[in-house]
Design a protein with these regions (language model features):
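Residues at the N-termini of beta-strands
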Residues: 3, 84, 161-162, 211
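Conserved AMP-binding/adenylate-forming
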Residues: 2-6, 11-30, 34-128, 134-137, ...
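Short proline/glycine- and acidic-rich turn/helix-capping motifs at secondary-structure junctions
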Residues: 211-223, 293-294
Length: 294
């Protein structure tokens, strides 16, 4: 084996180097999605490979980086400017991507370009770079933070095998960056040490994670992606319970459920005598909803 393929999630440069050194096998990274039927782009097997990019577009595939400007107009981004990756190809069935009609609304730009929900840029040589997911952005007091920068920094640590950065609820800023990691077998490092590591490897101060937690294993999808909804549930539970403890209230979050209309909803249980409005005052300062459970 001389070449292997990587997809499903952006490949950190540090992981690429580790894999190539350990196996002497070169990785060709590409990008595709079910909604477009097949692959969208790939690094050339025999041509120039740009590590960290997902290569150049396939034949008969058109890729544009688009953004919405003031007034609602949609325009193309400049070279190396980050926007939403939008794809038109024979594999994109405009208006019929999903069987549920509601899901197809606002899913296309200019009638045929599928909005992938992925953020990326195209460099002057035509190589596509994925920078994150629009819905994964951490919004701290109105400031957008790309979790990929935090994850790249954590994966640069020799003890870290997998990392997932998300926004944890905050009563003042809306969200603050935090991260969860899975360690390399036999490695040892604390969350506090990784927080300090990020302070020297994450360039933007606002993106420094306020909390890093080491888990025995990160939740993953069937294709090996870090499953961030489970991490968000952990963060909601941790931050809400910390707020309840600080307020000395007899209540705790016992679960976080995924409601189709409201999103993630904390389930709060009474652990003693208290007034309902006291809990409402504390948890009402956060953006994520909550409900009482018996």
């Amino acid at each position: 084996v001389k070449t292997s393929f990587s997809g499903s999630a952006p490949l950190p440069l540090e992981l690429f180097k580790r894999f190539e050194k350990a196996t002497n096998v070169t990785i060709v990274e590409g990008y595709g999605l079910t909604e477009a039927t097949c692959l969208v782009s790939v690094n050339p097997v025999d041509g120039e490979k740009k590590v960290g990019s997902v290569g150049i577009r396939f034949p008969y595939t058109d890729v544009r980086i688009l953004k919405q400007i003031a007034g609602g107009d949609v325009v193309d981004c400049a070279a190396d400017e980050v926007g939403e990756i939008c794809v038109a190809s024979p594999g994109v069935w405009s208006g019929n991507t999903y069987t549920e009609a509601d899901k197809n609304r606002d899913l296309y730009h200019f009638g045929k370009f599928l909005r992938t929900g992925d953020l990326g840029r195209i460099d002057p040589d035509g190589y596509l770079w994925i920078t994150g997911r629009a819905k994964d952005l951490i919004i701290r007091g109105g400031h957008n933070i790309d979790p990929a920068e935090i994850e790249e920094a954590l994966l640069a640590h020799p003890a870290v095998a997998f990392a997932g950065a998300i926004g944890q609820p905050d009563a003042h800023a809306g969200e603050l960056p935090c991260a969860y990691v899975e360690l390399v077998g036999g490695a040892s490092v604390t969350g506090a040490e990784l927080v300090e590591h990020c302070k020297t490897h994450v360039h933007e101060r606002a993106a420094w994670p306020k909390h890093v937690e080491v888990l025995a294993e990160l939740p993953k999808t069937a294709v090996g992606k870090v499953f961030k909804p489970d991490l968000r549930k952990r963060a909601i539970t941790r931050t809400y319970n910390a707020a309840l403890v600080e307020a000395k209230l007899n209540a705790e979050v016992v679960d976080v459920i995924d409601d189709k209309k409201r999103g993630l909803v904390a389930q709060v249980k009474r652990t003693g005598v208290l007034h309902d409005e006291e809990v409402g005052h504390v948890l009402g300062a956060f953006t994520r909803p909550w409900d009482w459970v018996a």
